[in-house]
Amino acid sequence: MLRFPKSPGPLLAASFVLMAAPSVSQAQSDSVLYRAAVLRIDAPGPMPISRLSLPAEDAGFAGATLGTADNATTGAFMKQSFETETKALAPEALAPEMERLLGEGVQWFVILGDSAAVSQAADLAGDRAVIFNALSTDDALRAEGCRANLLHIAPSDAMLSDALAQYLVWKRWSDWFLIEGSHPQDRALGAAYRRAAEKFGARLTAEKVFEDTGGARRTDSGHVQAQAQRPVFTQGAANQHGVVAADHAGVFADWLPYHTWDARPVAGSAGLRPVTWHPAHEAGGAMQWQARVEKLSGRQATEAYFQVWTAL
């Protein structure tokens, strides 16, 4: 459930002030330029299991190009113009890049990064800019990590787990075998699924933690070993309607579909996943939007594209 404050308070007030103040002075023609930046922070992490899952070098940026073009269409009638700078950064480069952009008058930042990157960006911006979180689903960013200048486009783990729980219960797949990873973000996601299960009347008939011990999963021998281990890992669990995987780190979930000891559907971080965008979306102009993304980038739209476009 979403909770809203009784009054807009400083968050909305600050946002309205920034929206009313363009990043450059109005010229005599009353033409106004609005400048934004989309920063993707590429933190180090494990390689995906499949090369098909490797992100494109410009991942997310097609949404920025499309969003800026859409703004310009309406802006032309309002004597407004829009510029958006896109950049992929290492985590240590975020601070100097933001200071440069803030110094140039940029007041809107769309951040594609983990919760640490989003928090750092919001703290750096202070009252000088509004930050849009277009990627991190961390519940803590919406609770104790909330900032007055931070707006969320990406849904939270709580929202996504609620969506999945509602569907599974509707399908009467209400008995779950929950497998969560050993990383802190995996444990947080597992907690979100437990809350969702209690909220919507599902039961956790079995729980297990998958310990990340590293290993050569992308070599031939590593692949064979992983394929043999997954069924055994899921063996002996109490009867369940499906497996729910909590694997933010991307260590094990992709191996679960069709590899469980008992033939059961897999949901969560693999298999049936709660997402903000899917190629099957057709209503509300979705087909036209996806066709435009494909024409622009040569690839199918992703959640990152959609969330960046929404932010702008």
Region annotations inferred by a language model:
Residues 2-12:
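Bacterial N-terminal signal peptides that target proteins for export
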Residues 12-21:
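Bacterial N-terminal signal peptides
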Residues 47-48, 54-86:
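Signal peptide-proximal N-terminal region
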Residues 64, 281-312:
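Extracellular/periplasmic ligand-binding modules, especially the Venus flytrap/periplasmic-binding
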Residues 73-91, 147-149, 198-220:
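Short beta-strand elements in bilobed, periplasmic/extracellular small-molecule ligand-binding domains
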Residues 88-107, 167, 220-238:
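Short, well-structured alpha-helical segments in soluble
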Residues 107-208, 269:
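Extracytoplasmic ligand/sensor domains, especially the bilobed periplasmic-binding protein
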Residues 123-131, 175, 184-288:
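Extracellular/periplasmic bilobed ligand-binding domains
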